[in-house]
C-alpha cells in the first residue's frame, strides 16, 4: 500500500469517527433542548408541541428567535462570510470553531421550533473537522476533497441514522463521482458514523408511514404528476437561493429574526404542525387517519403554512437546512394532488401519494434524484413496494428540472 493510500485510509477512519461523534452530539443536544422547551421525553415533536399550550408555543419560538438573532449577530460582527460545505469541498478554508458556533446555533433554534432543517449543522461541523484532519495527515488536494465531502455526508448520515443516503449524498451532490477512490471512503465513513451515533440497531423511522401498497392508479399518478412535482421542487430551490441571499447579517437581525419567530409562533399556536424542521408537517401529511375528516382543506393549509414559515425564517436571517422542509412540502403537494385523484380513481392511500410527492420534490430541489429517493426510503423505512410509481415520478421530475434549468440559462 502506497503512502497516499495509507493516509487516505487513516483519514477515512478518522472522518467516520469525527462525523459519528458530531452526529451523536447534535442528537443529544437537540433532544435536551426539546425536553426543556416542549416537555418532549419520547414520541414526536408534533405530539409534544400539540400537548403544550398555544401560549407556550408562541413563547418558545419567540425565545428561539431572540437567542438565534443574538448568536448570529455576534458571529457576523467581524466576519459576515459563511463557508458552505460545497465551498469547503472545493478547498475554501472552514475554521472548525466558527463552523461549530454556526452549527450549534442552528441546532438550538431548531430545537426551539425553528421552521428549518437541522441537517446542515452536522454536515458543516463534520466537514470542518474532517478538513482539519486531512490537513494534519498531509493528504493530496484530491484526497482532501474526497475526505471533506465524506465528512459532510457522514455527518448527515449520523444525525438521521441513514447510512446509504449519506454515502449517496456524498457521491451524487458533493463529489459527482463514481470512482473507487471516492466510493469506498463515502460508504465507509457513513457506516462508521452511523455505528457510532446510533449503534448496531436502527432507531424507529424518522416518519411513521403505514405499509404502502401498489396500484394502477398510483402508477399512473406517479407518471403524470412527476413533472409537476419536479417543477415545484426546482422553483423551491430557486426561491430559497434568492431569499437566503437577502437575509440580514447585521444589527437588523436583532429585529427581524425575533419578529419572524413570533409570527411562526402565532401560526403554531393554531397549527402545531409547522413547529420544527418539517418532521411534524410531513408526518401530518403521511397520516392517513385525518383524510376522511379534514381532507383536502387541511392538507392544503399545512402545506401553505409550512411554506410560509420556512421562507419567513430564512428571509429574516435564520440559517438551517431545507432538506426536511422539502420533504414536508413534497409530501404536502403529493397529498393535496393525491386526495382528489383518489376520489376520482380509488385504490391508493394518502400516505402513498405523500411518499411519491416527497421523493420527487426532494430530488428536484436538490438536483439529486438518487439521493432524494433513497433519503425518503430511509426516512420512512417504506418504499420498495411502490418503487415503480416512485421511480416514474422521480424520472419525470428530473426531466422537468433539466428542461427548466436549461431555459433559465
Predicted regions and their residues:
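Alpha-helical transmembrane segments and immediately membrane-proximal extracytoplasmic
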Residues: 1-409
Amino acid at each position: 500500500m502506497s503512502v497516499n493510500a495509507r493516509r487516505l485510509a487513516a483519514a477515512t477512519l478518522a472522518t467516520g469517527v469525527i462525523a459519528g461523534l458530531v452526529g451523536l452530539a447534535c442528537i443529544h443536544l437537540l433532544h435536551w433542548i426539546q425536553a426543556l422547551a416542549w416537555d418532549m421525553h419520547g414520541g414526536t415533536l408534533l405530539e409534544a408541541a400539540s400537548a403544550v399550550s398555544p401560549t407556550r408555543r408562541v413563547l418558545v419560538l419567540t425565545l428561539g428567535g431572540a437567542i438565534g438573532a443574538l448568536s448570529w449577530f455576534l458571529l457576523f460582527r467581524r466576519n459576515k462570510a459563511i463557508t458552505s460545505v460545497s465551498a469547503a469541498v472545493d478547498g475554501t478554508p472552514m475554521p472548525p470553531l466558527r463552523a461549530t458556533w454556526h452549527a450549534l446555533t442552528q441546532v438550538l433554534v431548531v430545537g426551539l421550533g425553528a421552521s428549518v432543517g437541522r441537517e446542515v449543522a452536522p454536515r458543516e461541523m463534520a466537514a470542518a473537522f474532517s478538513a482539519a484532519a486531512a490537513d494534519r495527515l498531509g493528504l493530496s488536494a484530491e484526497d482532501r476533497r474526497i475526505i471533506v465531502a465524506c465528512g459532510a455526508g457522514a455527518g448527515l448520515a449520523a444525525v438521521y441514522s441513514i447510512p446509504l443516503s449519506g454515502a449517496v449524498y456524498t457521491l451524487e451532490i458533493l463529489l459527482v463521482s463514481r470512482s473507487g477512490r471516492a466510493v469506498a471512503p463515502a460508504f465507509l465513513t457513513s457506516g462508521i458514523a452511523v455505528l457510532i451515533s446510533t449503534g448496531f440497531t436502527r432507531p424507529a423511522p424518522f416518519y411513521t408511514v403505514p405499509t404502502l401498497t401498489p396500484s394502477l392508479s398510483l402508477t399512473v399518478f406517479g407518471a403524470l404528476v412527476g413533472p409537476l412535482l419536479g417543477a415545484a421542487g426546482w422553483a423551491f430551490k430557486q426561491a430559497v437561493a434568492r431569499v437566503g441571499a437577502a437575509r440580514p447579517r447585521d444589527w437588523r437581525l436583532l429585529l427581524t429574526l425575533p419578529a419572524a419567530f413570533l409570527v411562526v409562533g402565532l401560526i403554531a399556536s393554531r397549527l402545531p404542525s409547522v413547529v420544527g424542521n418539517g418532521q411534524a408537517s410531513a408526518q401530518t401529511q403521511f397520516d392517513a387517519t385525518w383524510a376522511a375528516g379534514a381532507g383536502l382543506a387541511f392538507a392544503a393549509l399545512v402545506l401553505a403554512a409550512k411554506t410560509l414559515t420556512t421562507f419567513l425564517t430564512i428571509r429574516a436571517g435564520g440559517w438551517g437546512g431545507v432538506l426536511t422542509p422539502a420533504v414536508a412540502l413534497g409530501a404536502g403537494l403529493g397529498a393535496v394532488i393525491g386526495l382528489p385523484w383518489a376520489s376520482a380513481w380509488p385504490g391508493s392511500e394518502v400516505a402513498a401519494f405523500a411518499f411519491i410527492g416527497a421523493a420527487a420534490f426532494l430530488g428536484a430541489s436538490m438536483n439529486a434524484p438518487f439521493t432524494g429517493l433513497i433519503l425518503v426510503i430511509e426516512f420512512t423505512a417504506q418504499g420498495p413496494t411502490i418503487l415503480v410509481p416512485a421511480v416514474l415520478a422521480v424520472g419525470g421530475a428530473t426531466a422537468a428540472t433539466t428542461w427548466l434549468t436549461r431555459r433559465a440559462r
